[in-house]
């Protein structure tokens, strides 16, 4: 669940960002006002309790029928064969490619907790050369960059990914990046801000 990634960060969510644009709500730090639980139906309250303590969850609650399957997909993707480090690397890749500062900030916590190296994190954040990071990390970043930038994966690169992670691992990595690309699109649409105004991606050159 995304709650695991954003739990240490979500406590800051309800503070006001500095110099908010006029279309940004001061409580949510986004264009969407916070949904009030007591205004929901009993059925939707159950969904709210599962998803509403993360920013993507709060966005999805504007369409409750979508919120639960989105949460379930994310939860299942956390239990893949790839393990927590590769999961977090995939999430960071998606956040980087969409310049999604809020998503990056939340997943940076999870990546460090999972043991992703600082060199790998910086290679993703600043689009650095991959020669000095672990080979598996570099391969996953190449896979993600091909998907997001070229919109295709060469036969040679795909074969390398399959050799390293297996067919299932290759597919699961693509789904994880796709899931966080979906979240990034939703967060970009509502202009979700970091509560302290930090811009670790839009403030850094690719």
What residue ranges belong to the model's regions?
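Helix N-cap / loop-to-helix initiation motif
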Residues: 82-84, 115-120, 154, 166-167
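Short alpha-helical scaffolding segments that buttress acidic/His motifs in well-ordered protein cores
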Residues: 60, 70, 74, 89-95, ...
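Mobile cap/lid helix-loop segments that border enzyme active or cofactor-binding sites
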Residues: 16-82, 205-206
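Bacterial N-terminal signal peptides
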Residues: 2-12
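Acidic, carboxylate-rich catalytic segments that either coordinate divalent cations
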Residues: 169, 178, 182, 186-206
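Mid-length scaffold segments of soluble, non-membrane domains
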Residues: 87-124
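A contiguous pocket-lining binding segment that forms or flanks enzyme active sites
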Residues: 116-118, 124-143
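Acidic/histidine-rich alpha-helical segments that form the ligand environment
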Residues: 134-174
């Amino acid at each position: 669940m995304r709650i695991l990634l954003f739990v240490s960060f979500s406590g800051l969510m309800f503070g006001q960002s500095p110099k908010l644009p006029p279309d940004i709500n001061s409580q949510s730090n986004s264009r969407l006002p916070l949904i009030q639980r007591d205004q929901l139906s009993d059925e939707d309250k159950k969904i709210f309790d599962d998803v509403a303590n993360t920013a993507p969850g709060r966005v999805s609650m504007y369409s409750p029928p979508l919120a639960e399957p989105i949460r379930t997909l994310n939860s299942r993707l956390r239990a893949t064969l790839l393990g927590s480090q590769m999961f977090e690397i995939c999430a960071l890749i998606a956040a980087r490619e969409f310049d999604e500062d809020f998503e990056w900030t939340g997943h940076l916590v999870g990546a460090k907790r999972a043991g992703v190296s600082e060199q790998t994190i910086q290679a993703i954040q600043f689009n650095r050369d991959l020669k000095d990071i672990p080979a598996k990390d570099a391969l996953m970043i190449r896979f993600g960059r091909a998907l997001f930038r070229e919109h295709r994966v060469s036969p040679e690169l795909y074969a390398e990914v399959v050799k390293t992670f297996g067919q299932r691992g290759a597919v699961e990595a693509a789904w994880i990046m796709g899931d966080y690309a979906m979240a990034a699109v939703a967060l970009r649409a509502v202009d979700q801000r970091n509560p302290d105004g930090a811009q670790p991606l839009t403030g850094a050159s690719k």
